[in-house]
Amino acid sequence: MASYKKKLVKLSFTGALHIGAGKNDNYDHSEEIIHSDTIKSALYATYRQVYPELSQKDDGEPFFASFRVSSAFPYFGNELFFPKPLAGFIPTFSDIPAENKSEIAKKSKKIQYVGFDLFNNWVNGIQPNVQQNHLDSSGKFLFSQPHEKNVKVLTRNVQQRVYIPPQGSDAMNTQPYFIERLFFGKEAGLYFLLDCPDSEMLSRIQVCLHVLGDIGFG
């Protein structure tokens, strides 16, 4: 009988990262999460390279059906972040006077990610009561516990580049374009949840993850 295996996978990045939005990706904007289907596809492509004798026997359906993954969201140290709920998430700041509603609304609107404990409390009907030092320096990340004011989970940078046509084509038809890159803080990165009941398949997936750590997700 297969044992039940569930893992938390953390991805750390030593350099810049651009997360595309699909076939029609505009390079001047990077996503901040890696969607679950992208993670699964990257794992399958690596699985076919590492285990060709297994992957060539089928169309991939047994592989995709053997495990589940979440999308990859930001983390900082031990703090796991979830996207802020679209509705009903109403934090109060104990160090901002209640009558200063515009300031509270401004800070609340800017929040995009919520720490696990605060998110879990909200799911159970408890609205967050926090202070301004629960926010990172960008105001986008709301930590479950107070943090240093200058904490940066991630920053963005837009760089101009030039596309040069392949040799033999119209070499004069160069095209400038912009690419946005993400830089994660020293203790930050992306995480996702991996749910794989089969121990043998889990071991293979872990091997594929180590390979992806060297070659990237694409």
Q: What residue ranges belong to the model's regions?
A:
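Conserved active-site/ligand-binding neighborhood in enzyme cores
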Residues: 1-218
